[in-house]
Amino acid sequence: MAYHTPFAAQPPVASSGLPLTLISLDDWALVTLTGADRVKYLQGQVTADIDALSADQHVLCAHCDAKGKMWSNLRLFYRGEGLAFIERRSLLDNQLSELKKYAVFSKVVIAPQPDAVLIGVAGSQAKTALAEIFTELPSAEHPVTQMGNSTLLHFSLPAERFLLVTDTEQAQQLVEKLAGRAQFNDSKQWLALDIEAGFPIIDAANSAQFIPQATNIQALNGISFTKGCYTGQEMVARAKYRGANKRALYWLAGNASRVPAAGEDLEWQLGENWRRTGTVLSAIQLNDGTVWVQAVLNNDLAADSVLRVRDDALGTLAIQPLPYSLAEDK
């Protein structure tokens, strides 16, 4: 089987019913940071403590403006001799221009890597399949491994899955090795798994709209409140210590006559009426017709609240439990 991306699109499947699947992640992009000041520079730009990040760990953190609003969130890790991060391709150019603003004063090179290949490996037997190709696999305890030009990231949520950062040659080998027993899908399958995991999706429509806590990044250990200064730190700290944050990320599931776009609002049922509320971050329709929506809503919303896609008289959405706790933020 010849390697080319994106893989043909199939309706996404929930993690509980997902067979072994290779997923082309063309909707995400890779950026690298190299140079003597790479750690110091990034430490002043993102919410995570980069000084404390070890080579076998990855972290989801935020890159904010001076008001604490996220330009984007970043899946950050070490790769080769430098740092790397993965973010949504839709906001890559704008986010990079913001990140590079002060780089001229530091020994750091920040560069997109358009030739890098990003592939998700998920579903039943994902670990077993990868073990036939890689001699060392990442785990929950050590979620990043490096082998040659390849970096493997492990995710425990919503179920065990892996993200491979590699080159075309290694990707070709993976596809050939697993072609007989794996199915293939495009970025929407990984998007569905991220929604199920409660990992916030920030696309261009929602860039510079939310503080990190409005998307649960603090619950995913993506904010350090003890590190030194970084852009937007004052507003992020205020949200924690003064209770300024009134929003949270939710996973909704149900029926809808259409899949809402990022940036749309939803409607919340109040008696016989519907009130507009919240902001859609991402949405997907599964193979069984169910619609999943990831949205930022008021964080005091009752668990049994009924919502719907805007002006959709035929559908309703219910709040689903996230696989992590927000208790420490209340």
UniProtKB/Swiss-Prot annotation:
Principal subcellular localisation of the protein: cytoplasm
Classification via Gene3D superfamilies: 2.40.30.160, 3.30.70.1630, Aminomethyltransferase beta-barrel domains (3.30.70.1400)
UniProt organism field: Yersinia pseudotuberculosis serotype O:1b (strain IP 31758)
Family classification: Belongs to the tRNA-modifying YgfZ family.
Organism phylogeny: Bacteria, Pseudomonadati, Pseudomonadota, Gammaproteobacteria, Enterobacterales
Subcellular location: Cytoplasm
HAMAP family given in the database record: tRNA_modifying_YgfZ (MF_01175)
Protein's UniProt keywords contain tRNA processing: yes
Gene Ontology MF annotations: folic acid binding
Family annotation (PANTHER family): TRANSFERASE CAF17, MITOCHONDRIAL-RELATED
GO cellular component: cytoplasm
Superkingdom of the source species: Bacteria
Protein residues bound to folate: 28, 190
A Gene Ontology BP annotation from the UniProt entry: RNA modification
Coiled-coil regions listed in the entry: none
InterPro entries: GcvT/YgfZ_C, tRNA-modifying_YgfZ, YgfZ/GcvT, YgfZ/GcvT_CS, YgfZ_barrel
One Pfam family recorded for the sequence: YgfZ_barrel
Name of the protein: tRNA-modifying protein YgfZ
Keywords attached to this entry: Cytoplasm, Folate-binding, tRNA processing
Reported function: Folate-binding protein involved in regulating the level of ATP-DnaA and in the modification of some tRNAs. It is probably a key factor in regulatory networks that act via tRNA modification, such as initiation of chromosomal replication.
